[in-house]
Amino acid sequence: MSRVGIVIASHSDLLARGVAELAGQMAPGVAIGAAGGLEDGGLGTSYDRIEEALEAVLAAVDGPGSGAVVLTDLGSATMTAESVVEMSEAPERIRLVDTALVEGAVAAAV
């Protein structure tokens, strides 16, 4: 089990799941959550989806210094993720990372 997991927050469910799948194939032992799109299937970012993915990833990692990094595709996804972190019960375990989404996800996973 890894000490750090990854959440991919995107405006598109397909994009989030695709990036998570790619990173997961390259690092199968890493907890990776995908939070993309809106509940109705449309484009956008969902506070609830990001929160659920983050909670699942945090529950899957353990040990001293364990936590999660959140990678986003666009500015409003970053703002939504920032809100989730601010309201989190353990914000000290979460880091938002400003990087290219695909490359950053793969680098974080491996």
Residue locations for each model-derived region?
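N-terminal loops that bind phosphate or other acidic moieties
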Residues: 1-110
